[in-house]
C-alpha cells in the first residue's frame, strides 16, 4: 500500500506528461498533408527534381509568430482619446477645427448690405494715373464694302480643295533647284566606281554582273520596290567590287546585301532579312547576309547617299514643255538599260547618262531635242553628250536581242505605258 501510494503520484504525473505529448503531437499533425505524413507511400519522382529536393533538405521550418490581423478601414478608431500619439506630434498642438453652420435666411435678410470696394478698385484708386474704363461704344461702320467675290468655304468646289492637298515634290521647289543640282554634281564624282575594276577581278566577269543586275530587277518588281532602290543597289555593288575581290560564289551574296542596304535607305517599309534569304533560294543564311551587309558598309564607309541616274532624270523632267509621261517612262527605261552593261557606261557620270537618256527619249517620242533650258542648267550640250548618246542608242537598238530581258519585261507594263515596245530611231541627228 505504501509502495503503491509512493509511486502513485509519480506515475500519474508521468502518465499525464505522455498524454500531453501525444495530444501535442496530434495537434501538430492535424494540419499536415496526409501524403507528406506517410513518405513511404509517395510515388517516385524524376531524377532532376529529386536531386534539387535532396539539396534543399532542411529541418522543419520555424513557426512564424502569430501576428495581429490588419483591421479594415471601418474598424480603425476615429477621434479616439485612447489612440497613442507619436512623440513628435505630442507638442504640436493645433486648434481644434470648428464646423461652420449656415445662418437662417431671416438673419441674412435682416443684415444690412455693405458696399465694399474690390481690390482692383482700391489699386486703381491708389494710382491716380489709371482711370477706370468707361462704357463701351458701338462699333463704327466700315467705309468700304467687302469683296463680294469671296466664297464661303462650305460652298467651295472640291477641285480647289483637292488642288491644295497635293503634296509638293522636293525637286519642284524653285528656290533650291540650283543648290540641289550643284550638290548632286559634286557627290556623283565622289561616289563614282572605278572604270576598269572588272579587269582586276580574278573570278567574275561583266556577263556575271549583268546576270546579277537582271536578277535584282526581278527582285525589285517582286517586292514592289522603288526604281531608286535598284539604282542605289547597283552603285553599291560597283563601288564594292572596285575595292574588293569577290569569288563568283559570293557575287549573289554581295548583290543581296547591296539590295538590302538600298531598300533600308530608300523604302518606307523595306523587306525583312528573311525575305532576302528566301529570294536566294536559301543559298545563304541570315547570318551570312548580315555579315556581308556589315562588310559592304565598311567598304563604302557608310556613304550611302549616292546620286543616281534616276535622281537626275527627275530634275530634267521638270524642263518638259509640256510634260509627257511616255517620254519620262522611256527615259527611265533607257537609264535602267545602262545599268546592265558595265562597259562602257562606268566611264560616264550619272548626270551624263541621264541627259543622254532624256534626249533620246524626247527625240524618239516627240522628235524634239535637248532643251536649251537644260543646256544652261547643266552645261551639257549635244556635242558633250554625243559619245554617251551614241553608246546608249546602240544599247537601245540591241535591247530585244540582249540575253537579259527583265528590264524590257518590266517596261512592257501599262504602268510604264509599254515604252519597251516602241521602235527606236534608226539614226540620230547629232
Swiss-Prot record:
The alphabetical list of record keywords is: Acetylation, Cell cycle, Cell division, Cyclin, Cytoplasm, Mitosis, Nucleus, Phosphoprotein, Ubl conjugation
What ranges does the record list as Basic and acidic residues composition bias?
107-120
The post-translation modification note in this UniProt entry reads: Polyubiquitinated via 'Lys-11'-linked ubiquitin by the anaphase-promoting complex (APC/C), leading to its degradation by the proteasome. Deubiquitinated and stabilized by USP37 enables entry into S phase. Ubiquitinated during the G1 phase by the SCF(FBXO31) complex, leading to its proteasomal degradation.
Which Gene Ontology terms cover its molecular function? cyclin-dependent protein serine/threonine kinase regulator activity
Residues found modified as Phosphoserine: 5
Gene Ontology biological process terms, A to Z? cell cycle G1/S phase transition; cell division; G1/S transition of mitotic cell cycle; G2/M transition of mitotic cell cycle; regulation of DNA replication
Statement: the UniProt record of this protein carries the keyword Metal-binding? no
Q: What does this protein do?
A: Cyclin which controls both the G1/S and the G2/M transition phases of the cell cycle. Functions through the formation of specific serine/threonine kinase holoenzyme complexes with the cyclin-dependent protein kinases CDK1 and CDK2. The cyclin subunit confers the substrate specificity of these complexes and differentially interacts with and activates CDK1 and CDK2 throughout the cell cycle.
* Family the UniProt entry places it in: Belongs to the cyclin family. Cyclin AB subfamily.
What is the protein's given name? Answer: Cyclin-A2
Q: Please give the organism.
A: Bos taurus
Q: Coding gene?
A: CCNA2
